[in-house]
From Swiss-Prot:
<keyword id="KW-0472">Membrane</keyword>
<dbReference type="GO" id="GO:0045039">
    <property type="term" value="P:protein insertion into mitochondrial inner membrane"/>
</dbReference>
<dbReference type="GO" id="GO:0005741">
    <property type="term" value="C:mitochondrial outer membrane"/>
</dbReference>
<dbReference type="Pfam" id="PF08038">
    <property type="entry name" value="Tom7"/>
</dbReference>
<protein>
    <recommendedName>
        <fullName>Mitochondrial import receptor subunit tom7</fullName>
    </recommendedName>
</protein>
<feature type="transmembrane region" description="Helical">
    <location>
        <begin position="20"/>
        <end position="36"/>
    </location>
</feature>
<keyword id="KW-0813">Transport</keyword>
<keyword id="KW-0812">Transmembrane</keyword>
<dbReference type="InterPro" id="IPR012621">
    <property type="entry name" value="Tom7"/>
</dbReference>
<keyword id="KW-1133">Transmembrane helix</keyword>
<dbReference type="GO" id="GO:0005198">
    <property type="term" value="F:structural molecule activity"/>
</dbReference>
<dbReference type="GO" id="GO:0016887">
    <property type="term" value="F:ATP hydrolysis activity"/>
</dbReference>
<feature type="topological domain" description="Cytoplasmic">
    <location>
        <begin position="1"/>
        <end position="19"/>
    </location>
</feature>
<dbReference type="GO" id="GO:0005742">
    <property type="term" value="C:mitochondrial outer membrane translocase complex"/>
</dbReference>
<comment type="subunit">
    <text>Forms part of the preprotein translocase complex of the outer mitochondrial membrane (TOM complex) which consists of at least 8 different proteins (tom5, tom6, tom7, tom20, tom22, tom37, tom40 and tom70).</text>
</comment>
<dbReference type="GO" id="GO:0005783">
    <property type="term" value="C:endoplasmic reticulum"/>
</dbReference>
<keyword id="KW-0653">Protein transport</keyword>
Amino acid sequence: MQISEESKERLVKVFNIGKTVTHYGWIPLILWLGYTQSNPKPQLMRVINPLA
């Protein structure tokens, strides 16, 4: 089964978008999960800047 050129281009575009979203969203996701799942909740400024 062969994939058409148009389908290949769409797949490449989707993978590139997914790669970009993962690249820029990974650390904010981890920070958000840590902030929402911790008990007691730290002050938001301490999460963003530990020296504050």
